[in-house]
Each structure stands twice: as C-alpha cells, then as structure tokens.
Regions:
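A short beta-loop-beta micro-motif enriched in histidine and acidic residues
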Residues: 77-88, 99-115
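Structural recognition of beta-strand segments within beta-rich domains
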Residues: 92-95
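Residue-level detector of conserved catalytic or cofactor/ligand-binding positions
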Residues: 116-125
Length: 125
C-alpha cells in the first residue's frame, strides 16, 4: 500500500472513533518523534505490537480487501511470563464493501463484538 493510502485509512478510523466517542489510548496519537523520546513505560506497546495496523492482505485493493485496526491489548507468547494474555482486544474498521479473508490463530482467542454499525458476516467463495 502507498503511504498516502495508509494515512487516509488512519484518518478514517480516527474520525469514526471520534464520531462514536470511542476514546483511543494515548499511544495511538504518538508521533515518530515522541516514540524516540518515551522510555520503558511503553515497553508493552512495543513488545506486544499494540497500535495501528492497516492491511490490504497484499492484494493491492484496499477498498475491496482489507481493513484498519487498532490493537489495544495483546499477549506475547515469546514473553509469556511478562505478558500472559491469550486474547487480543482490537478495534476493527471495515468500510462499506470491504472484506477480510477468513483466518484463525493457533494460540489466540478472539471475540467479535459489533459496537458500531451493522453486522455483516458472510463467507465469500
């Protein structure tokens, strides 16, 4: 994906969160310069890969295949003594007409909770 597409997707997700009073953790608003300055108090964000993720699944058509998400909580199997969570908390945003391919995690539990919008789960063949 082009950086301009990623930036646009981030802005759309931020706008959706703001519109629906969904408050994001402070680290979602850090600039690259801020990340250079913060210390070990944010190691969990780095170690557990919390934050933004924008994907088109390598298909090159974000408006059709892909979504935007923010990982708020996550475990880390490589550091299970420090981060033992076996679940993740993520905010996912799919635009009208977007699809996400089926997938699963061997060692992660996910519950899908629709908080905003409508549920539209279907399998594409």
């Amino acid at each position: 994906m082009k950086r301009s597409e990623i930036n646009k997707a981030l802005k759309e997700l931020e706008a959706m969160c703001q519109k629906h009073c969904c408050y994001l953790p402070p680290f979602c608003h850090f600039t690259p310069e801020m990340w250079q300055e913060i210390g070990h108090e944010y190691d969990e964000v780095r170690d557990c890969m919390l934050g933004w993720d924008i994907t088109d699944y390598g298909m090159g058509d974000f408006d059709k295949f892909g979504f935007s998400l923010i990982t708020i909580r996550n475990g880390n199997r490589a550091m299970a003594d420090k981060y033992p969570k076996v679940y993740a908390e993520k905010l996912l945003y799919l635009k009208e007409g977007q699809y996400a391919p089926n997938h699963f995690h061997w060692f992660k539990t996910e519950d899908i909770i629709n908080q905003i919008g409508r549920a539209s789960c279907r399998e594409r063949v």
